[in-house]
Amino acid sequence: MPAAAGAAAAAAPAVDASVTPTPAGAVPIDGAAATGASVPAESAGATLVAGASTAPASAVAAPIEAPAAVAAAPADVTPAVGVSTTSASSKAASIDAVVVGATAAAAAAAVSSADTTPTPGAAPTPSIPAPTDASILAPADLDAAVTRATDALLAAQQPDGHWVYELEADSTIPAEYVLLVHYLGETPNLELERKIARYLRRVQLPGGGWPLFTDGAPDVSASVKAYFALKMIGDDADAEHMVRARNAIHAMGGAEMSNVFTRIQLALFGVVPWFAVPMMPVEIMLLPQWFPFHLSKVSYWARTVTVPLLVLNAKRPLAKNPRGVRVDELFVAPPVNAGLLPRAGHQSPAWFACFRVLDGLLRLTDGLFPRYTRERAIRQAVQFVDERLNGEDGLGAIYPAMANSVMMYAALGYPEDHPNRAIARRSLEKLLVIHDDETDEAYCQPCLSPVWDTSLAAHALLETGEPRAEAAAIRGLDWLRPLQILDVRGDWISRRPDVRPGGWAFQYANPHYPDVDDTAVVALAMDRVAKLANTDVYRDAIARAREWVVGMQSSDGGWGAFEPENTHHYLNSIPFSDHGALLDPPTADVSGRCLSMLAQLGETTGNSPPARFALDYLLAEQEPDGSWYGRWGMNYIYGTWSALGALNAAGLPFDDPRVKRAAQWLLSIQNPDGGWGEDGNSYKLDYRGYERATSTASQTAWALLGLMAAGEVEHPAVARGIAWLAAEQREHGLWDETRFTATGFPRVFYLRYHGYRKFFPLWALARYRNLRRSGTRRVTVGM
């Protein structure tokens, strides 16, 4: 899912763990590498420690040449740019001037009005400055912006045709990696630890704690893990930054306020007793599918993370921890007295009370389970992991599950050179990003995102209409084609046993867990190329993708990220689910892309029941203020873009009240500088309406794409947004974006896709150019 995949990543390990699934190995190179321009510090010299698919930076730096067969395509082929273009010569035509900016007085007035608290459920009052005293963006400048961004994106394409960018989460994943090495008693790579320590210190807040997203509030669990990792690496507990961290943790109630996954980590190191961890007996593995707690009733990410944890809970091993590091000083009271956490805000009081009683009963009876039953349950858990180990791409292709599988094998006495333990351990190294540039840092990714990155980059390039860009997009899709999962019936068969496989995973390989969102986006791109080049080379792939996506539709008409009907909401009230991320219910963003796919493939709400049900679901999910919730991207801007693209593809007229309300909402939240922004605070349980945040390139692009899907290409606010993107573009052709704009698990785990600021702005600029040149308001593709 853009996230969708991203999703899986952090889930189970929730609060601190990762989010999106993806394994693999490649070298994320910033698009500027081949242009001769300066490369952003954050990605220059970054190396993904990965496997065979990794290419040396030098191999990626050269611009991609269009394959001769594609470059020589017939001149009368219409570029798949999302709108009807007129002729090849029209690409040289000038476009109307783009209005940029506003007077200082108008901007000040807008800022003043923006401070007004919005009425709950109502669209915020528009506060967009009028386009007075404007400067003009010449048509040639817009063309140049598209060209520079295209150059940068092409330069980042891997030799085999795909794209993969860094996927950054918060401090918890690199901290957990450090702790894992010492848990296993391995000899640490001191240079790597030094770089990770630099990263952890840099993302520490001035107040001492660590946040879940840029400029966010300190999070006690993230802070405990980061402090523990730094102390394990060798930072003096009396160092200024460590004292600040300790004080911040105490101010949040101490380490005893940590979430379940942090408590498990502390229990493994002997800091807290296992009593502080909710009971999760391994005998769960033996329950029948109809049972309320069967594993098929939770999400894929929760399943892959939890199964090895069940074994750890049964074995309760103690970390080797050769340096003997402890963090008792982070507790307000003695850690040995740590009890269970109270009910979380998302949990039902009644259900939680029932489950807390059950937790107590399980503690009383834990020693009474027959030994042979426990051993049988452990064997079943190991079998589950073995079957899904996924080679060097790892269990579930997400860090938490992969790390837990390594610890499980170690707890069961598997030697380091046992094939399963060894390959599980190697899979973690492929998630490392090591910067050898001036930043001199390293961190561990929650997963890898090559399928997501490649499919979205292809869409952006197709939008430009340039032959070289289209050729590169085709190379990317040709790389994707053999990755379609056609012969593995994954865990989704528990709900849809008669559906044939046909999806794509989020990562390089994850055959048991294809991703609905990725599959829809890949099929959309392949269909664009099929129409552009008048080819049927992707016909079978698209047909199987459509068949599988329709098979994954839930009974309410929507789609979850990985499986249908994953809506057993009572499970998020068990003590183990303080993170609230056990489930994968249908969401508007994923459902919007599935409807977009069906509509682009020619299905209408009149001739296709799946499309009709999807439209009904999407319209029912619209918020009172006109927006849609964004599960995998941050947040309502992302969800609203996803929904508007689908409504346009489904043929809703621009004057439909639902479309107009959504467009008005986007217009009303534009920042005075012309961009759009939103942060993780929008996921809080007491959210009452949009809260302004710093403009970002990716969110501005989403808002613009949404407005253009709503027929608002001529609106002055769109011109201001386009001008903002053009003004923020750097010499290397890309955009700077340090803020997190994606979501692994709301309120728990957020993501920063380094590719988002590269392909989404290009996509928006190119679409704007296409619509203005063609003189039409209607976008003719699904995304």
Predicted regions and their residues:
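Preference for long, amphipathic alpha-helical scaffolds in soluble/luminal domains
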Residues: M1-D16, T20, G25, D30, ...
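Intrinsic disorder/low-complexity segments
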Residues: G6, G36, P40-T47, A62, ...
